[in-house]
Amino acid sequence: PYTITGAPRVVKGNVLIVNGGAELGVRGYLSAYSAETGSLVWRFYTVPNPNKQPDGAISDNALKDIGNLTWGDEGAWTTDGGGGTVWDSIVYDEVNDSVIFGVGNGSPWNRNHRDAGKGDNLFLSSIVAVDASTGAYKWHFQTTPGDNWDYTATQTIILADLPIGSEGASRRVAMQAPKNGFFYVVDADTGEYLSGEAFVPQNWAEGLDENGRPIEKPEARYGETPFMQNPGPLGAHNWQPMAFNPDLGLVYIPAQEAPEFYAVDRLFKTRVQNWNTGTSLPAGIPMDLDLATAMAIRATLKGRLIAWDPIAQEARWSVEHLNAWNGGVLSTAGGL
């Protein structure tokens, strides 16, 4: 089935349209249509064809050289499309003439069901850059390799020029605070990882390595044992837009702390036009959970507005909200 949540964008005479609903068993892509004729100009698929053969699309070379190598030949992805929908963030970088977009979660969420628990599954949960005119692949940075938790990278992508180059020289960067709880700064021209740090408390990774890859805690894969994880599938930051004030050099993130128990759905079977995750969230909750513990868990649900310094990779200030789920942010030149 076709669904869409993010608004189309117009870049250089082309209308960029995407699809949503990875859990419905679809394969993600970004399409460019001519605004004048309505004809398809190019299409970039975010995950391989299930048989790993060419699609006749501009993404063929990138998938052949990069994507196919990170997927196995078995698992639900071969019949369910693999996911990777581009359901929100798309930006045009006029300096590098690139379209930069965020890719969503896998179908199903649980990698053990999706791909027999193997591989990074590119370009799931990645920031991808393509040529604005042709759609040809330029670079990618994967925020959550082998995503297992609905940790999309479709959240707001902001372009900026920051003084983080050699001797404080300005550098064109892309910034994102995706669901997984880490704030990333990458080079907008090459995709090189520059820095990253957790912007909310999280318990699924020890941190990021020198290449920006999360250092996962083994228990976070919730194989035999359910795991209560922060962030949960709602993420540390969801679709609510974040904002950047270039005068102050701060990014304002509508963040949340919403942990969740993850467990394997051992009875998983794809259901057409249904929500297919391969993950049993209720099954992860201990049946003997006492009221006091349940209330303590509920008290951990928080929302906050964080003013984040992308150079120092730390919060300047934060304001806690009564509820976890709040609205987006607009930062003005007047200081609001």
Which residues fall in each region the model found?
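Noncatalytic, solvent-exposed loop/strand surfaces
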Residues: 1-336
